[in-house]
A protein has these predicted regions:
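An N-terminal structural lobe/cap that precedes and organizes the functional/catalytic core
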Residues: 1-93, 162-192
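An amphipathic alpha-helical core segment
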Residues: 99-184, 188
């Protein structure tokens, strides 16, 4: 899962929203460096990643990608699943996406102690409405382009959009089957 799904699943309180994002930016053991609510959300983020990586429906989705794209298929699928969530937001959330993202951006903008890499991208995330923009399929090309700049072999992501176009319907169906199970997992995750 990518940013939007983690934020959606991680809880709506400010500390939970922050921790849901921090999960991609904070590595190693958590030993009281953040408030308990933030650390709890980081732990949930990590557990969501493990649940997702081990789920048979995700294995099916990953197997749809060509062998040349398999190395980074997990990254591409995470981004695509955020697109599916944004596109079909009303099926999975009670509040409109624009209100949800506005709350996330408000919390993010008011936090002064963001992890270093998140602090660098947060202003761009807010200014360009990264989370809301996932509704538009073509935005994924920009997202994947940004990710590819951090990879050792960026050329392997170069044709990912062509593959996503080809796999759009089957991967969308994979998401429709998988996401409710992920919601149940997150809802039943033990909180501290």
């Amino acid at each position: 899962m990518n940013y939007l799904a983690h934020l959606h699943l991680g809880g709506q309180r400010p500390g939970q929203l922050l921790g849901s994002l921090y999960g991609d930016f904070v590595k190693g053991r958590l030993q009281g460096q953040f408030a308990p609510e933030i650390e709890g959300a980081i732990q949930l983020h990590r557990s969501i990643d493990v649940f997702t990586d081990r789920h048979p429906l995700v294995d099916v989705a990953l197997s749809r990608f060509s062998l040349t794209r398999r190395r980074y298929a997990g990254i591409v699928l995470d981004v695509f699943f955020d697109h599916c969530l944004a596109r079909d937001w009303t099926l999975y959330a009670d509040r409109p996406l624009a209100l949800f993202t506005s709350d996330v951006y408000r919390v993010l903008s008011s936090e002064r102690q963001l992890p270093e890499r998140l602090a660098k991208i947060a202003p761009h995330m807010v200014a360009n409405d990264w989370l809301g923009s996932y509704q538009e399929f073509e935005v994924l090309d920009q997202v994947l382009g940004g990710i590819s700049r951090r990879l050792t072999r960026p050329e392997e992501l170069a044709a990912a959009m062509q593959e996503l176009r080809r796999l759009y319907e089957p991967l969308s169906e994979d998401f429709r089957l998988f996401y409710p199970q992920l919601q149940d997992f997150a809802r039943n995750y033990p909180t501290t």
